[in-house]
Amino acid sequence: IEVALDYMSCGLDPSKATIFIQSQISELCELTFYYMDLVTVARLQRNPTVKSEIQMRNFEASIPVGFFTYPISQASDITAFKATTVPVGGDQLPMIEQTREIVHKFNTVYAPVLVEPKALLPENEACQRLPGIDGKAKMSKSLGNCIYLSDSADDVRTKIMSMYTDPEHLLVSDPGHLEGNTVFTYLDAFCKPEHFERYLPDYANLDELKAHYTRGGLGDVKVKKFLNNVMQETLEPIR
């Protein structure tokens, strides 16, 4: 229910988009088993997304079969409905490529009935892979490092104020680093010029803010408070 509410809050119209519970469509499971005969273990092991997830979840020593084969299940979810375009983050591109391979092989072996989907990436590159608030991996419900669309204003504020920044930026006067700094990654993704007019008029744009941070004299707390204002404005219509 929560996921469906998120979908509709973001603008999906249930009169135009069908929202369903994946586990209740038994044909998807059946299609997954057919696809398993078209994919080798070696190919799954080469999938960059699978390799990254295995390392992140410490599955190297013992990989659950269900986890290992989830790219095949995703291929079923996509192809069963003849999807032509799939909105994804950058880390999911290998999944789309693997789906296209399955489609090509199925159509070659059996009949040309499946559609090869294309990936639709966000235009803003920073939105293609948002890290978790801990800065260690992408946002993931299982890792507990997410900002949820339904989070209250207080929850969002608490999470932003605990965000990973630059561990070497100990004093306000210290020069800060942008690379790997989660706060600036989120600003790259969500900040707009008008946000400076409303919440941080001392700066004309994000480039000026970054320049001040890297030369020193700008504290993490001030930047986080600005990000909180940006995120609250972004999420309020969804709430």
PLM features per residue range, with description:
Residues 1-75, 194, 233-235, 239:
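N-terminal Rossmann-like or analogous alpha/beta NTP/dinucleotide-binding catalytic cores
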Residues 7, 35, 91, 136, ...:
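Divalent metal-coordination and catalytic microenvironments
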Residues 13, 39-40, 52, 62-64, ...:
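Alpha-helix initiation/capping motif
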Residues 32-45, 70-81, 169-187:
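A short, terminal or domain-edge coil/loop segment
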Residues 46-47, 83-84, 111, 142:
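A short secondary-structure junction signal
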Residues 57-106, 110, 131:
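Internal, conserved structured core segments that host functional sites
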Residues 94, 100-239:
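Conserved nucleotide- and phosphate/pyrophosphate-binding catalytic cores
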